[in-house]
Amino acid sequence: MRITFTSHGWEDYVHWAESDRKVTKRINRLIADIARDPFKGVGKPEPLKGDLSGYWSRRIDDTHRLVYKPTDDQLVIVQARYHY
């Protein structure tokens, strides 16, 4: 599965890489788990509704969520900070 980031998703990832290595490790673990199975695993995966239908989220911590969109051959990371 190919992993790509939106510009906003990459900006969030870089923010964590520069400010908090622990959160960056958690995000990397979530991404690896999503690549194995986008719909089950760590971080309480849940499908989003409404305008974000087709997207999924997983918990990075109590405040922040990793929002992503899985397709057949690609995983798009949309957001890695804040709550959707």
Swiss-Prot record:
A Gene Ontology molecular function term for this protein is:
endonuclease activity
Indicate the residues that form the catalytic site.
Answer: 46 (proton acceptor), 83 (proton donor)
Species of the source: Streptomyces coelicolor (strain ATCC BAA-471 / A3(2) / M145)
Q: Report the Pfam families cross-referenced here.
A: YoeB_toxin
Annotated GO biological processes are: negative regulation of DNA-templated transcription; RNA catabolic process
What is the protein name for this chain? Toxin YoeB
State the family named in the UniProt similarity comment for this chain. Belongs to the YoeB family.
- What does this protein's UniProt record list under function? Toxic component of a type II toxin-antitoxin (TA) system. Has RNase activity and preferentially cleaves at the 3'-end of purine ribonucleotides.
- What quaternary structure, including any partners, is listed in this protein's UniProt entry? Forms a complex with YefM which inhibits its toxin activity.
Write out the entry's keywords from A to Z. Endonuclease, Hydrolase, Nuclease, RNA-binding, Toxin-antitoxin system
Known EC number(s)?
Answer: 3.1.-.-
Q: Does the keyword RNA-binding apply?
A: yes
- Report the domain of life of the source organism: Bacteria
